Amino acid sequence: MTQSQTDLRNGPDATGMFGAFGGRYVAETLMPLILDLAREYEAAKEDPAFKEELAYFQRDYVGRPSPLYFAERLTEFCGGAKIYLKREELNHTGAHKINNCIGQILLARRMGKKRIIAETGAGMHGVATATVAARFGLQCVIYMGTTDIERQQANVFRMKLLGAEVIPVVAGTGTLKDAMNEALRDWVTNVEDTFYLIGTVAGPHPYPAMVRDFQAVIGKETRDQLQAQEGRLPDSLVACIGGGSNAMGLFHPFLDDKSVEIIGVEAAGHGIETGKHAASLNGGVPGVLHGNRTFLLQDDDGQIIDAHSISAGLDYPGIGPEHAWLHDIGRVQYTSVTDDEALDAFHKCCRLEGIIPALESAHALAEVFKRAPTLPKDHLMVVNLSGRGDKDMQTVMHHMETTKQEKH
């Protein structure tokens, strides 16, 4: 057996590669900064004071550990696997994003940075970044595509309330990819005082590994909680994937447990065959974007194709390089779910459990509705409920009205 098949949690290598994916594809001006960040992060990881402070904020500010909840009514409805929900939507700010933001802001402060920049799609990472910047009294600038600003107005207002400046990005389709491009441009011109707080397991090394490490608290807690409740490990894990940080947070602590089946769910939008989707692994090819090599949605000329998903947090045309590698070696199974399937799962979760999930998380739930009924009753399935659905009310209302009109 190769090293890569037995120690799956050891990546990346010193250059930031997970197999053929990852790396540091950045402008020369950024390279010293990236290397400095990697050094600082390695030092922080070994520093008991940093770990202690991180644990304090995770507990008393974020509200961790988040519950691992037995979804009795979902389980009854499916009539198969026993379904547990990892309740990340109960965190401060309503999603998993804060786990990473609290870690990175402590690092930024350690490095003496005074200005924080970030990109956001659904607005949840923007809100979480603005939140931690407010808590530590740092200047905060959020880049957000105009399309996303339109569909996530409540989150834009939240960011401004928290003291952040929200800069609209009109380039491209005005979504996450474009916001990330602008944030990288800002960083290049303000390297001295600025810390770029990336929101997912993408970007140049050390970001994919660093974000994963801060999110891995999800999977570590899940191991302990399920052991306490069921006396054993789960049989399967399910999580939605845009860039892939909530999924990597749940998956990573289980990668070396061969008995645990791992399923990542991409956004199929209108369907993979239509070309209007955000499924980089199921409908993309390898290429370089935002500082790393990964699977991307691109045309024959290598130009990035715009991603589509009803969920603003999933319509990124790439995926974290560690996911690309796990797909490549076959450790994780990557499936996809359409807008309609996600909406159906969204409604079922509301009615059956009294929990309004984010549309991102509803993609994972849709996969559960497909799989759980085919599995035995002693199969333990853990689903990452990555965020709450408050931000999606407008989208769901609009979709319901449109559907109603189409029927008449």
From Swiss-Prot:
Keywords: Amino-acid biosynthesis, Aromatic amino acid biosynthesis, Lyase, Pyridoxal phosphate, Tryptophan biosynthesis. The modification N6-(pyridoxal phosphate)lysine is found at residue 97. Its EC number is 4.2.1.20. It comes from the Bacteria. InterPro entries: Trp_synth_b_CS, Trp_synth_beta, Trp_synth_beta/beta-like, TrpB-like_PALP, TrpB-like_PALP_sf. It catalyses: (1S,2R)-1-C-(indol-3-yl)glycerol 3-phosphate + L-serine = D-glyceraldehyde 3-phosphate + L-tryptophan + H2O. PROSITE patterns: TRP_SYNTHASE_BETA. CDD domains: Trp-synth_B. It holds the Pfam family PALP. GO terms for cellular component: cytoplasm. One of its GO terms (molecular function) is tryptophan synthase activity. Pathway: Amino-acid biosynthesis; L-tryptophan biosynthesis; L-tryptophan from chorismate: step 5/5. The keyword Amino-acid biosynthesis applies. Its cofactor is pyridoxal 5'-phosphate. The keyword Lyase applies. NCBIfam families: trpB. Belongs to the TrpB family. The beta subunit is responsible for the synthesis of L-tryptophan from indole and L-serine. Tetramer of two alpha and two beta chains. This is Tryptophan synthase beta chain.
